[in-house]
């Protein structure tokens, strides 16, 4: 299909963009890489001639999205001598939307893209009431969930409905294919969910540990945000189970365990020995036994493919996570407000759970996940630190008020206010800046050349996207009966009418 598309660069880019947004690009990964590589090689020549904002912004985004570094200077042709975007651009809604989406792939020292986000966001808010209903919905969705900061399946479900509205440009064959593909995958996800739910019920931890959040469906959706493609069925299964254990661990350390109990559990997990069970309380014995059994089962399965070495890396990250949770518990019980950078943020890399989840996300992946790759991710490379910082801080912002009422450990908000004498609003503003700076680091880490194959970096990026989605305006994981419930229903349970 892709090979038959017109050879002109802009038309090719439009087609690639459409199949990506419709969620079917995973069928054409090789063809897309070939096409974008060809476009990248001749990029400087043809882009210099183009004064079409949509074409320039679209090419910039798709190339960066694929890992190709292209200069943001290409947008200078759309600015005046002071570096401000030309006012007449506001009449080009599609161009403006493309610029907005492209700017979210910015790295450090790209003020022109910082300005692009300010410019497009400001003007879209003014333009919204004047746009057609269909375009207004599309822009509103983009303002809340830009392409680089959303869950692919949720965006696909929305975009299919947007695309159908564009009667003049809608390719009927393509839209029918996208709907069919979405529904086929949805049926597969339902079967996967049945397997996970059966495992969860047999484990019975939700009943035995009544204080813990029972969110197996939400956690499956979380793993689906990391990889939705059919070939990652085993990886999704393992990651969802790890997410279940991480969620329970968080609740034990955050809300239920006494410091003495947590000391014993931390030591038991460090030792990873069933003999350590003797000193634990009854509910911790159940949890600890289930955790050991889970990793043993994964190890046996991976041994069949000579990949059992991966489990030791996953367990090592789980131990680091438990240490980080335990450190937070000690701060809480000691009424300590840690230093923002050298204490809270350093510990927060692990307490975000992203290093544990990123490593676990590779357990069921293909041969690209080598021992060297696992060794690399265990060193906390910059891309993982950025991802973890974003997840940690987003969680802190949306849970801050609730945790103050509950008397939880000091979050980054309190740490910043305490250290810099800032107001709550100033702390929020600064922390949002820190989040955006970490996104720039993350975007940089996804550009070629990369230390490990890009297929391994995608789960790290997608874990961050899930955090952006789940912690957008609220803690949608803890309070999942709100907006998240509707999104999960659309993705997992509501087929598209073909």
Swiss-Prot record:
A motif (DDXXD motif) lies at residues 250-254. The keyword Methyltransferase does not apply. Belongs to the terpene synthase family. Tpsa subfamily. Its cofactor is Mg(2+); Mn(2+). Sesquiterpene synthase involved in the biosynthesis of volatile compounds. No activity detected with geranyl diphosphate (GPP) and farnesyl diphosphate (FPP) as substrates. This is Sesquiterpene synthase 15a. It holds the Pfam family Terpene_synth. It comes from Solanum habrochaites. GO terms for biological process: diterpenoid biosynthetic process. Keywords: Magnesium, Metal-binding. The Asp-Asp-Xaa-Xaa-Asp/Glu (DDXXD/E) motif is important for the catalytic activity, presumably through binding to Mg(2+). Pathway: Secondary metabolite biosynthesis; terpenoid biosynthesis. Signal peptide: none annotated. Mg(2+) 1 binds at residues 250, 254. The lineage of its organism: Eukaryota, Viridiplantae, Streptophyta, Embryophyta, Tracheophyta. One of its GO terms (molecular function) is magnesium ion binding. Binds 3 Mg(2+) or Mn(2+) ions per subunit. Gene3D superfamilies: Farnesyl Diphosphate Synthase (1.10.600.10), Terpene synthase, N-terminal domain (1.50.10.130). Mg(2+) 2 binds at residues 250, 254. Mg(2+) 3 binds at residue 403. It comes from the Eukaryota.
